[in-house]
């Protein structure tokens, strides 16, 4: 763990988290780190993004026990979810919270219908709810990105429309504004 702190600039708890993932998967820390870097690079290439590999290593290392358990302790799955979260301008824990809010089906569907009525935009969150139900946080991140308003659209909305759009996505207005 001390080597990770020096080499990757990780905090003590982050280095410990990465070491635990390596131990759980039966792989070396170097293998785990390399797979996280490869996963981030592949995501960046596929999505024309520039998400920091170091940030994703830190995000994977500090993923909550609940997220790790939901994703089977798989470093690649956690890295995919973390990159999808960062693409949204969020941390993995925030996407996990959104997944939880989408599981309140009645409220989620009500918010979706309200947003459609107020914005005139077709919003379909059924796939997002399915992904949340199946603990697919990477897929959920992509689905949230797909259903978010573009910056131009978001800028034209009034405050009530912005709040409704964000609520339908399980987010706050500020979170939606970051996308």
Mark where each language-model region is.
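Amphipathic alpha-helical assembly segments
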Residues: 1-178
């Amino acid at each position: 763990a001390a080597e990770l702190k020096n080499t990757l600039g990780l905090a003590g708890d982050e280095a410990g988290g990465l070491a635990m993932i390596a131990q759980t998967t039966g792989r070396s820390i170097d293998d785990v780190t390399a797979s996280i870097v490869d996963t981030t690079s592949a995501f960046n290439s596929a999505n024309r993004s520039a998400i920091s590999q170091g940030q994703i290593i830190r995000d994977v290392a500090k993923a909550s026990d609940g997220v790790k358990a939901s994703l089977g302790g798989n470093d690649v799955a956690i890295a995919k979810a973390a990159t999808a979260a960062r693409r949204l301008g969020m941390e993995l824990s925030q996407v996990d919270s959104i997944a939880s809010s989408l599981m309140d089906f009645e409220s989620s569907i009500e918010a979706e219908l309200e947003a459609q009525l107020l914005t005139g935009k077709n919003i379909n969150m059924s796939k997002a709810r399915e992904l949340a139900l199946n603990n697919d946080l990477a897929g959920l991140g992509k689905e949230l990105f797909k259903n978010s308003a573009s910056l131009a659209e978001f800028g034209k909305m009034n405050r009530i429309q912005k709040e409704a759009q964000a609520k339908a996505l399980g987010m706050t207005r500020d979170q939606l504004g970051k996308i």
